[in-house]
Design a protein with these regions (language model features):
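C-terminal substrate-recognition/cap domain of FAD-linked oxidoreductases
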Residues: 101-105, 111-338, 344-346, 350-353, ...
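Intein/HINT protein-splicing elements and their conserved insertion hotspots or analogous self-processing inserts
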Residues: 50-95, 182-196, 206-209, 213-234, ...
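Short, conserved loop/turn and helix-capping segments at secondary-structure boundaries
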Residues: 23-24, 145, 333-337, 372-376
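Active-site cores enriched in adjacent His and Asp/Glu residues with nearby glycine-rich loops
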Residues: 1-5, 286, 354-355
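FAD-binding subdomain of flavoenzyme oxidoreductases
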Residues: 1-155, 160-162, 389-399, 403-408
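Short low-complexity, flexible loop/linker segments enriched in glycine and/or proline
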Residues: 10-13, 181-183, 324-327, 369-372, ...
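Ferredoxin-type iron-sulfur electron-transfer modules and their immediate structural context
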Residues: 274, 349, 353, 361-408
């Protein structure tokens, strides 16, 4: 959550969140990194043109070898890297080989490799970042739906209006919100729509929060108005939105985003022995695959008789999914492994990644599943170049090529 985020943590997980379709990940804003290597050596990382890269390779210590090995891997395996790394804004983190050269400057840039490496390559001691001015104007549209499937299926249409963010909140979160103080502030905005006769239309069970930002107020209003007209054209038809609420009021916008921020906290109030758990929480697939992917994901969870909550960044294909399990029950505890394995296969089927936002951590054993064995060995070569004795966050992402230690 934003009240606990630190820049160091953001760099090390290559963090992103609401608005990442527009603003990208942390690595997209890193200009320079100063890092301490496992032997105490200081490494300065900046984008390098070919001549400068050649000079870096001539340096003494393990830094020179790092530049040689990384350059060799990304140069020799260009085609394989392009084939393996998914083409989406929530790109693969944890040794991002695709961006070492495939960045906006087209220069060798180690920052993309270090960002998201979760402390396994070096300790970041200093970061120089690019700042982006905050938008002057905001407008928020609360689009209402009867079902979660309707909300997901509508995302592709909503994306055509080029919003800064689209966030989905499912029925579970909205239901729990009714027992929280936040509901008093937002209940009118998520209420069931009524027809001209005053009779209720289809109930509002889930919502999409669609935010527009910009410096030109008139352009912003035209964007929102155009989207409202599109929604009106199919208003209340089966499978479509039941209605919407439009606001530019800063306090209303803040209250509605507070509902989204409270999602995890609200889930903590779930009654019973089963509690929502975050072990498959940040999978990501291309947005055009999201509705079909989530449909299968839900079928999988329901086959175990599990309840769950889903919310998050529908615009970039990353939904936070928390199945509710009773960890005091040994059988249900074993389902964490079963479900994780099955979700990995499902994510791969839809050309996605298992870790779209929160880093790899204890899911590192799935690295080879997504990178393939050949690139997995190259990642281990890179780890060996940076940390030959496996001192830095050992067991996470990969282990050095010369070590038999296991990942977690």
């Amino acid at each position: 959550p934003s009240n606990r985020a630190t820049l160091g943590g953001m760099v090390n997980t290559d963090a992103c969140g609401k608005g990442s379709r527009i603003y990208g990940r942390t690595s997209d804003h890193v200009l320079e990194l100063t890092c301490v290597l496992s032997n105490g050596e200081v490494l300065e990382s900046v984008p390098l043109e070919p001549e400068a890269l050649s000079e870096y390779k001539k340096k003494s210590g393990i830094s020179a070898n790092i530049f040689k090995i990384v350059d060799q891997v990304v140069s020799e395996k260009t085609n394989l890297i392009q084939e393996v790394f998914p083409k989406m804004s929530r790109f693969m983190t944890g040794y991002n080989l695709a961006k070492v050269y495939g960045n906006s400057e087209n220069n060798f840039n180690l920052n993309y490799l270090l960002s998201g490496s979760e402390g396994t390559l070096a300790v970041v001691s200093k970061a120089k970042l690019r700042l982006t001015p905050l938008p002057k104007h905001k407008s928020l549209l609360v689009v209402k739906y009867e079902t979660f499937d309707d909300a997901l299926s509508d995302a592709e249409m909503l994306l055509k209006s080029d919003p800064a963010a689209i966030e989905t909140i499912d029925e579970k979160i909205l239901s729990l919100a009714k027992e929280d103080e936040i509901y008093l502030k937002i209940k009118d905005f998520v209420a069931d729509e009524k027809g001209k006769s005053g009779r209720k239309k289809r109930p509002t069970r889930t919502i999409n929060l669609v935010e527009f930002c910009g410096s030109n107020k008139n352009h912003l209003e035209k964007q929102v108005t155009a989207l409202c007209k599109t929604i009106d054209a199919t208003n209340n038809k089966s499978g479509k939105a039941t209605g919407y609420y439009r606001t530019v009021d800063p306090q209303e916008i803040s209250n509605l985003w507070s509902l989204r921020k409270k999602g995890v906290g609200l889930l903590g109030n779930t009654k019973g022995e089963r509690k929502p758990l975050p072990f498959v929480e940040d999978t990501a697939v291309p947005p055009e695959n999201l509705a079909d992917y989530i449909r299968e994901f839900r079928t999988l969870l329901e086959s175990y008789g599990l309840e769950y909550a889903m919310f998050g960044h529908v615009d970039v294909g990353c939904l936070h999914v928390r199945p509710a399990l009773d960890l005091k029950n040994p059988e249900e505890e074993s389902w964490i492994r079963e479900l994780s394995d099955k979700v990995v296969e499902l994510v791969k089927k839809y050309d996605g990644v298992m870790w779209g936002e929160h880093g790899r951590g204890f899911r590192s054993e799935y690295t080879a599943e997504f990178f393939g064995e050949e690139l997995h060995q190259d990642l281990r070569r890179i780890k060996e170049a940076f940390d030959p004795n496996n001192r830095l966050n050992p067991g996470k992402i990969v282990t050095p090529l010369s070590h038999d230690d296991k990942v977690v």
